[in-house]
Design a protein with these regions (language model features):
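N-terminal secretory signal peptides and thylakoid transit peptides that target proteins
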Residues: 1-13
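Glycan-recognition and catalytic cores of secretory/periplasmic carbohydrate-active enzymes
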Residues: 23-458
Length: 458
């Protein structure tokens, strides 16, 4: 199927979610499609193993390695760790064992270098925990705890309990107090899971305290801005957004309730969500969007939508607002129909791409999966199928799948990077949507903001 045919298919699919009178999705052979996803995953993995095994990321056009944590320093095998539970749930057991052997023989966090606490938490700690959940390899749990301990000074050295952005893995030295909601409030899933696994409540408590302190600094209209000084607790900006750098804070408020039954998280989620719906939800051209607003007045600041904000459709549905969740997914489905591949940034007031790159983002398909888990219906699968087919058409390169530098050119101009999260998120979401996977519990499950499965692997 070429790009023109795919765009026609996208356009035909746009009404699928446009109203509550839903149109049935076209008949598809989902199991065959799932096997294709598995085949593509295995092919990409083999290229990574042959070209740069153990390196953080692969550049699929050139076949070279790309560091993530320490440019010029030791890699942490990021792509291996991100891929572990995806390989497991797909039944690619030889590949998973290959990754575990590399981790057991090579991974060592005693490095005199600093890491970003947020990224390391969701990617390394989270990836090791989900790998442990699937494979039961005790070494993975021990490494997850080791890394969490090395990140802990970011919390314990903070006068407020909100973490610093960077920490040295060997010395515990911390840096950069000017942070944001996502980097402050996206730990409870990983840290809480670690507390349950080890019996050590310290991890849960430090993650919860950071979120509570941030929540307590909300404005009088119950919104948070996107930049704050964690030492003083003073806001540095007035911009409120459901997108980055605030997005996963809202996600983890719900997740703290879903995973651990902690009513404090449910209360905080409800307070913020009511304010977001009141001050940020906006209809434009028949679509639901969430503009950036002043967090103290609710005045609209701009109409930019980051592709990362597409996750919010699934979160709204999980939180009980299925109607708005469907409506927001429909808005993004129309953007997908317009461009074929979602742009990194979209201005809904101008109906134009603000950022023409595509970073192999998974958030749209993440929402398709979350809605599918709540309401199994092939319309969500169909939107994800179109997303997958276009990824194959536009992003497949000699040695894997790559980002796109410009989605508006014909053909689309490829970049040269496969982000670590591609292994953890995008391919897993496709597989779970298309396969009826026998290693996944579709009734009782939990996936983190990085797509790591902490509950539900069989």
């Amino acid at each position: 199927m070429n790009r023109r045919h795919l765009l026609k298919a996208f356009a035909a699919s746009a009404p699928l979610l446009a109203s509550t009178s839903l149109v049935a999705a076209p008949k598809q052979d989902w199991r065959t499609l799932a096997q294709d996803v598995r085949t593509q995953m295995a092919w990409a993995w083999r290229n990574y193993v042959e070209r740069c095994f153990g390196q953080d990321q692969i550049k699929p056009v050139s076949g070279r390695a790309e560091p993530f944590f320490f440019p010029g320093g030791p890699p942490l095998g990021l792509s291996i760790i991100e891929a572990l539970d995806t390989l497991y749930v797909m039944g690619l057991d030889a590949e998973a064992e290959e990754g575990i052997r590399w981790i057991a023989n090579n991974l060592n966090f005693d490095i005199d270098g600093e890491v970003q606490v947020f990224e390391t938490g969701i990617r390394i700690v989270g990836g090791l925990l989900s790998g442990w959940h699937g494979t039961k390899e005790k070494r993975l749990l021990a490494l997850a705890r080791d890394m969490a301990d090395r990140l802990s000074p970011a919390f314990t050295k903070s006068p407020t309990g909100m973490p610093y952005r960077f920490v040295n893995l060997r010395t515990g030295a911390v840096r950069d107090p000017v942070s944001n909601p996502a980097e402050i409030g996206t730990y409870i899933a990983e840290w809480g899971t670690l507390s349950k696994a080890t019996g050590d409540k310290r991890y849960y408590d430090m993650a919860k305290r950071a979120m509570q302190v941030l929540f307590d600094r909300r404005s009088k209209i119950d919104l948070v801005a996107d930049t704050i000084n964690i030492e003083t607790g003073a806001w540095v900006s007035r911009r409120a957004s459901i997108g980055p750098p605030s997005d996963s804070y809202f996600e983890y408020l719900w997740d703290g309730w879903q995973l651990f039954g902690d009513v404090d998280f449910k209360r905080m989620y409800d307070v913020h969500t009511a304010a977001i719906v009141k001050y940020q939800a906006q209809q434009s051209g028949g679509h639901l969007w969430f503009p950036q607003v002043d967090f103290e007045t609710g005045v609209v600041l701009d109409h930019h939508q980051s592709e990362l904000a597409a996750f919010y459709a699934g979160l709204l549905a999980q939180g009980g607002d299925m109607a708005r969740g469907k409506a927001y997914l429909a808005s993004w489905a129309d953007v997908q129909a317009k461009f074929g591949v979602l742009p990194e940034g979209y201005d809904y007031a101008r109906a134009a791409a603000e950022r023409v790159t595509n970073e192999l983002r998974p958030e749209f398909v993440d929402s398709c999966l979350n809605l599918f888990l709540l309401e199994p219906d092939d319309r969500y699968r169909e939107l994800a199928r179109l997303h997958y087919e276009m990824m194959k058409t536009s992003s497949r390169a000699a040695y894997g799948f790559t980002i796109i530098d410009d989605i508006t050119t014909a053909p689309m101009k490829q970049g040269d990077l496969c982000p670590g999260y591609w292994w953890s998120e995008q391919m897993k979401y496709y597989w779970l949507l298309f396969s009826d996977a026998d290693r996944f519990d579709y009734k009782n499950n939990y996936l983190s903001t990085e797509g790591n499965v902490f509950v539900g692997l069989k």
